[in-house]
């Protein structure tokens, strides 16, 4: 029984350490926002980062308001939303 406790504790410690090592990685908060075309009707071709597919996709931006997950071109979207490594 003590052996199982020690092994369980060791596994838990490894998970905690691994989680701590990944702190600071990931994408910027703006890349986690849903696409928002805003209330205007300009229909400007833009790109947003799709969290589910982890790719940049085209959408039509209305030209006003919206949110920060809105990029003029696919290259900027990919560069800004690439997962950051520490």
Swiss-Prot record:
Alphabetized Gene3D superfamilies for the sequence: Pancreatic trypsin inhibitor Kunitz domain
Inducing factors: Induced in salivary gland during blood feeding.
Disulfide bonds: 31-81, 40-64, 56-77
Tissue note: Salivary gland.
PANTHER family referenced in this protein's UniProt entry, alphabetically: BPTI_KUNITZ INHIBITOR DOMAIN-CONTAINING PROTEIN, KUNITZ-TYPE PROTEASE INHIBITOR-RELATED
Function statement: Anticoagulant protein. Increases fibrinolysis time. Inhibits thrombin generation. Inhibits the generation of the active forms of host coagulation factor XII, factor XI and plasma kallikrein.
Protein name: Kunitz-type anticoagulant protein Ir-CPI
Record organism: Ixodes ricinus (Common tick)
Gene: CPI
